[in-house]
Design a protein with these regions (language model features):
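Charged, terminal alpha-helix-loop-beta segments
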Residues: 1-325
């Protein structure tokens, strides 16, 4: 995809963004994506509150889109009417794009309200099923600048041919080194046990880490830089095929387990400590580059100083010291 093609896509993105009220923008993220395994459908996915709202892409040079799944109508009957307008197959490709860009601010508000309801829905077991995805979207939105000492997020919910997927993928610079960060995010107790536990995700991430072709991410990085007018333009882009790779476990919303006001959804120090110790045991003598990151909440930047990013062993020591206090 060349710069002219990306500009066409981004003009549509700008039109849509102008219809989204400021209060909602924190929880949206336009993510560079290839919509098929052959990389013939290249474009962007709009995530809102963790859910996939829209795929906007080029196919054989023609701009097209697909929209949210019909199942979201259970959270709002009104958005199903908007969906019916958008999936109308009549007219040329240009007319279909015109229908998309003509959706009003009021209708976009209905759509995003429905996605927020989906994210905050509590099932019969009193567990918020998509809370992490909602916060994950905000983290991706917040971390779009490519600066020394920070991780720039270039993709979320990335999936490869073997089906393994990190929550977020980022790029960072450390002196003269460029590093691809495969990030697994945890912020609730429900995501710390069973198949969702950190150690199980570590096993999956190792497979992804070895299987996924970093060249794909080079394209995502370039598109992300163009989209955000980043100083790291594609002309100066880095060869991500030869980038160093790391696995990162990111934790937020950690509370004191002795605090009586602690909600069941929030992580405790012990939750995180147990999870990281299991990772350490699974790592054994491997040379995998695994980092642990801590942020207060989804509004914080992903800084890579030693207060936020640590080795597995240092994270264990830090958490054990917190438990003693």
């Amino acid at each position: 995809m060349n710069k002219e093609q990306i500009t066409k896509l981004q003009n549509v993105i700008k039109t849509i963004n102008a219809k989204i009220v400021e209060a909602r923008r924190k929880y949206i993220f336009w993510c560079p994506k290839d919509m098929d395994i052959e990389h013939k459908k290249q474009g962007y996915t709009l995530y809102a509150y963790g859910g996939r709202v829209l795929d906007l892409y080029l196919l054989n040079g023609v701009m097209r889109y697909s929209v949210w799944d019909k199942d979201y109508k259970s959270y709002s009957e009104e958005i199903d009417k908007i969906r019916e307008i958008l999936i109308n197959k009549s007219g040329t490709a240009d007319k279909k794009i015109a229908r998309l860009t003509s959706i009003s601010t009021e209708d976009w508000e209905k759509v995003l309200t429905a996605f927020k309801t989906w994210a905050e829905y509590i099932d019969n077991n009193k567990k918020t099923t998509h809370f992490e995805r909602m916060r994950e979207t905000a983290i991706a939105n917040k971390n779009q600048a490519f600066k020394n000492g920070n991780i720039k997020i270039i993709e979320m919910e990335s999936r490869n041919a073997i089906g393994k997927k990190p929550d977020l993928i980022g790029v960072r610079r450390e002196k003269d080194n460029i590093i691809l960060s495969y990030i697994e995010y945890k912020c609730t107790t429900a995501a710390m046990t069973g198949t969702q536990s950190p150690v199980e995700h570590y096993k999956d991430m190792k497979k992804y880490y070895k299987d996924r072709t970093p060249a794909i991410f080079e394209s995502y990085f370039e598109r992300s830089c163009w989209e955000n007018n980043d100083k790291a333009k594609p002309d100066d882009a880095f060869d991500l095929k030869n980038a160093t790779k790391e696995i990162v476990f990111l934790f937020s919303h950690i509370t004191d387990e002795n605090n009586e006001s602690n909600k069941s959804q929030e992580l405790t120090v012990q939750d995180v400590l147990t999870g990281i110790k299991a990772i350490k045991t699974e790592m054994g003598r491997s040379n995998d580059d695994v980092k642990i990151m801590f942020i207060k909440d989804e509004c914080e930047r992903l800084k890579t100083d030693n207060k936020h990013m640590m080795t597995v062993q240092d994270a264990i020591k830090w958490l054990e010291a917190k438990k003693v206090r």
